[in-house]
C-alpha cells in the first residue's frame, strides 16, 4: 500500500512511573500523583512556579490532567497555571486529558477558558487523541457539551473516524457515525476510514462501516489504486477481503453479482418458499388424493386429507402474515419529531455506571441513529433495528422479532404438522395400492414406476418436514428459555448474558411456564430482567457447594 502507517500520538512521556514508594519531590510529581497537600506546600511555602515546564517541557497542569485530578487542576489554574499552555509538540492539558478519558479534568479546563479545538504540531485536536485511545465517553462529552468538531481533519487529512477505524475501537466508530461523521473522507493518501480498518484487519470496524455506509465507500480507491477489499487481500486479511467483496457485489446493480452474494434485494427467497408450498399442495391433491390409479378415498383418509389441506392453507396465511408484518422495527431518528433546540440525546448517559456505559455505546446504531434497546439488533438486510431480534429469515424475506415471532412460530408448527400428515397419507395410499403387487416386482420399483407424482411429493415433503421440525424444535426451546437465536449465537460477545460470576446467565429467563405463557398470550416474551444475587453471595454459594461435594 502506498500510504504509510499512521503514527499514534506518543504516550511515552505521559506514563506514571511504577513503584511501591512514591517520591514526590516537586510540583510536577505532586500533580502527577494527585498529592494536593504537598502541591500546596511547594507553591505556598516554597514559592514554586506552576507556569514553568519541567526538564522535558511538560507542565504540572498536563500531569494532573493525564491522571484525572480535577481538584489539583483547579488549584493549578487558580495559582498561575495557563490552561492553554502547550509543550514542545504544542499539546495542551486537554490533549493529555483525552489520553485517559479524564472527563472531570476536561470540564475544569474548558470551563476555565481552555480551547477545545487546540491542535498540536500534527494537527491533532482533543477529538483525535480521544479517538486514538478509544476514549468514547470523553469524545462524546466534549462534543455534546462543548461542541467540539468531531469531523475535523488533522494535518494528514485524517478525521477522528480514520483513527478509530485504524485502531479498531468499535464503540468510538459507532459514536462518530451516530453523529454523522463523514466516512467518505479521503486523507492525503486517498484512504477512507474503511481503507484503514481493512489495512489493520479489524473485522468489527469494517462491519460497522459497511453497514452504515454506501456502495461508494466500498469502491473508493486510494492513490495507489487499491480499494478496501484489495488492501485487505494484500495484507493477508482474507476473511475481511471476502466480506468486503461480498458486500460490494450485494450493493451492485448487476443481478449476477446479487446472486453470487446471496442477496436478492427485498424479495429474498419468499417466492421460492411460496412456490414450494403451492407445488406440494398441487401434488398432494392430484397425485395423492385424486390420482385415478390409486384406491378410492375412504372417509377416514378424506377427513385427514381435508385436515392436511386446511393446515397447509393456514400455513400460507401465517406465511403471509409473518412476511408482511412489522417484526418490531424501532423508530428511526427521521421518524421521530425533531426539536432543534432539544438537549443532546447522548449528553446524560451515566458514565459512572459501568453496565450502562458498556451497553449504551454498543447500543448506538449509526445507521438508524437511535439508542436501541438491549435485545435489539440492526439487520443489514432489512436496514432497520428490530426489537427482540431473533434472526433474519430469507425464506420469509423478513426478520423475526418481537412483533411477528408468534406468527412465525405458528407458521412453522403448521408447516411441520401438514407435512407430517401429508407424508403419512401418501405412504398409506401407495401402500394400499400395492396390495395387488406382483410377487416378482419390488414395492419401491412399483411406486416409482406407477406413482412418480407420489414419489416427487414425498421427496419434497420430507425435506420440508425435516427443515420445519428442526426449526420448530429450536424455536420452542428458545421460547421456553426466553432467549433468541441471535443471543445464543453471540452469547460470548453480549455482556448482559453473563452473571456476576462471569459465566453465562440469561437475565430474561423467568421459568418455562411464565416464558411460554407470555409468548402465547402477548405474542412475545418478557424483557424485564431478573435480579441477580450479589457477587459475594455467589461466591459463598459456590464455596458451600464445593464443601458439600468434598464431604
Predicted feature residues:
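Ankyrin repeat boundary/linker residues
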Residues: 20, 54, 87, 120, ...
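Conserved ankyrin/ankyrin-like repeat signature
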Residues: 38, 71-72, 104-105, 137-138, ...
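Ankyrin repeat domain, specifically the short helix-to-loop turn at the C-terminus of the second helix
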Residues: 43-48, 74-81, 107-114, 140-148, ...
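Membrane-associated feature with strongest affinity for ZDHHC
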Residues: 235, 245, 249-392, 396-551
